[in-house]
Amino acid sequence: MKIYYREKSAGIEILRCFGIESRVEIPGMIDGKLVISAAPYAFSSHMDEKEDLKNASLWEVSDGLEFGREEHVLAGNDVEEIVFPYTLKEIGRYIFYGCGNLKKLEFSDSLMQIGCGAFTGCHALEKLTIHMRQGKKSGVKEMLGEMWQRIDVNFLYEYEEARLVFPEHYDEAVENTPARILYTEYHGSGSNYRQCFYDKELNYQEYDRLFEMAVAMDKLEVLVDMSFGRLEFPYELTGKARENYREYIRKNLGDIAEYLVKQEDMHRLEVISSQKLWTLEGIDSALDCASKRKETEVSAFLMNERANLVDNTAGSERIDVDKLQNSQEADRTEQGKNEQSQTTEKSLNRRTILRKKRFEL
């Protein structure tokens, strides 16, 4: 890979990259100096290379993959994934302008300065991964503010991880012809979720509080990823929020289980088991779907889980019956004691009366 760059007072600024792979990983150091920024239009196909690369320095590294293959500029639709080093602090304006195939972006919480229009035209971007090395603040809010589509965000803290979903949001003008009224119709809860940041820090309690709104406005697959993501990676998840996510899965188990079967998502079917959320109705719905799709592995797993569920249910019922029988037996014993006590008392009273009568005679 070849990288054109310029030296600045504090470090290196990336100008342009050339290579053969759609995944671009920027080094943290070039010629012994830290890489601290990426220039405007650095990954855009709209850069005037002849003008902007004048007097630029060249850094080159070979990994053996280029043999017999011609390098090309890594910009526009030729870029699908970019990994920035933890040293990078700034990206310039319109840096990804027109990168229509860019899907993943990885960086650290050092990246705080985001140039205007940085993500213009990045309609395929779907995932951000942020290495949180310094605290809880990041440049994610500014990035999300430029994109309307659903974005999955992974925050990687020192010892924990948070996997979040920021749903899509858009509005459209709808005309009511008879009334001659034009009004705006809003779709998706993404706009509200993007407001959960305060001073560049995500408020997880506010994020979880919005789930009720998401249930009313977003699609099943979005809600599944949100709820399972929070339950599996419960960073700053309160007990109340945890129960809200569990309750959503429990109430919609039939639809969710069918969706997971169609996605062949064994992992999340196992999560339902570990969270003890299965019901007979939900598991039968999943079994029916797996059977129709001839998913033998999934069917075997679900049949085993169903058997365990039936056994546990029967065990609970047996325990309840035993408790009832023990309770009834205790009641009968107590009743017998009371009757015996009453009989003894009556006998004593009768003797007392007879003594009184003899005394009177």
Regions found by a protein language model. Give the residues of each.
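Structural signature of tandem-repeat unit edges
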Residues: M1-G11, F18-I36, D48-E90, G100-Q113, ...
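Ankyrin-repeat boundary/"N-cap" motif
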Residues: E247-K262, S273, L280-S291, T313-Q325
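Long amphipathic alpha-helical scaffold regions
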Residues: I114-G139, D284-T313
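C-terminal per-repeat helix/turn "cap" of leucine-rich repeat
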Residues: A42, H72, Y94-I95, G117-A118
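Charge-dense, extended regions
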Residues: D288-L361
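Ankyrin repeat structural motif
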Residues: R93, E264-S273, E295-N304
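Ankyrin repeat domain, specifically the short helix-to-loop turn at the C-terminus of the second helix
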Residues: G239-E243, V271-W278, A300-L309
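Surface-exposed repetitive/solenoidal architectures
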Residues: M1-Y4, I14-G19, A39-A42, L237, ...
